[in-house]
Amino acid sequence: MYRLQISWSRIVPDGDGEFNEEGIAFYNRLIDDLLARGIEPMICLYHFDMPLNLAEKYNGFLSRKVKEAFVRFGQEMMKRFADKVKYWIVFNEHNLYFADGFEHYSGVLKKELTLSDMYTVFHHTMLAHCELTQFLHENFEAKIGGMLATTEIYPATFSPTDNLYLRKFDEFYNRN
């Protein structure tokens, strides 16, 4: 198995316009080469590569318009490659969109961020994930899932307080 990411910015440079056929041809050749060598490809549709135009114009996944543009991109990639690729990931490390620093992964350029902004980004990315999952299941014989970030953590001491903090952090960060 070989996991690759199709760069949204390479395929749709402005994020919501025309598809770059040269970029699609590159990934088509890559997938064919993997399969010819007996290597099963797994496609990730988003690995922190928000098209700059969408970040500047709409503040990334804070906008439902960006969610819609991403779903359009994802559906097109599925139409192009799902006959050859049986394993899909929508968002790399999707749980990071619901944690401190979410703006770095979601194309948000806004300086003053609120808790509501984080909820909005997570809501829009979850909607995109659900829409693409439904699209894939309704149209192709393929599997789709998520990719979560985890962090190995240890208590500073053996004290009950440090261990309680560790459990709370682990539950929120690694298991949400």
What role is predicted for each listed range?
Residues 1-7, 40:
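Catalytic domains of carbohydrate-active enzymes, especially glycoside hydrolases
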Residues 11-176:
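Non-catalytic scaffold segments within catalytic domains of secreted glycoside hydrolases
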